[in-house]
């Protein structure tokens, strides 16, 4: 029968000047669409390190972590196994609008979008939920004049 395999990934919702970073992935014709940057935890890494590394590897962006947002969980099947995936998400701040999608990771486009645009672009509903949660955290920090004040964090 199918084996159940647990997998852990980490990713980031990256914001610069109120806009959110999303990536267009075209994965070997298996699926394509707009996604948030994320990837698998490597041996010896903590979740924050994974999230920062994956954001940098997939987008070229060097971001800073502001806070933990939460996790999304979902299951998918491969011919051999059932994969139970947990993704830990961090709210991050970039220092410019620069991004460069990494083609070797199947990313063909990237950019910073206003919240409602990014929300509608995203392919997966669990990523839409995380985007909304992260954006609301950002708005709260901004309202309290804490966004961009790195000393506070």
State what each model feature region is.
Residues 41-129:
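Unchanged
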Residues 123-153:
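Charged phosphate-binding loop/patch that engages nucleotide di/tri-phosphates or the phosphate backbone
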Residues 3-36:
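N-terminal strand-loop-strand
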Residues 1-4, 152:
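Short, low-complexity, intrinsically disordered N-terminal peptides in bacterial proteins
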Residues 27, 66, 70, 105, ...:
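Residue-level detector of alpha-helical recognition elements and their boundaries
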Residues 11, 19-21, 47-48, 68, ...:
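A generic structural signal for ordered secondary structure
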């Amino acid at each position: 029968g199918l084996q159940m395999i647990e997998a852990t990934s980490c990713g980031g919702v990256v914001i610069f000047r109120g806009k959110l970073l999303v990536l267009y992935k075209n994965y070997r014709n298996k699926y394509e669409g707009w996604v948030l940057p994320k990837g698998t935890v490597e041996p010896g890494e903590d979740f924050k390190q994974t999230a920062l590394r994956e954001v940098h590897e997939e987008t070229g962006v060097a971001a800073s972590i502001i806070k933990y947002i939460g996790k999304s969980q979902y299951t998918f099947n491969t011919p051999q196994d059932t994969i139970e995936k947990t993704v830990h998400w961090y709210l991050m701040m970039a220092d410019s609008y620069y991004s460069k999608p990494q083609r070797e990771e199947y990313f063909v486009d990237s950019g910073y979008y206003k919240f409602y645009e990014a929300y509608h672009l995203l392919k997966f509903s669990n990523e839409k939920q995380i985007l909304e949660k992260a954006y609301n955290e950002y708005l709260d920090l901004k309202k309290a004049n804490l966004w961009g004040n790195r000393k506070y964090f």
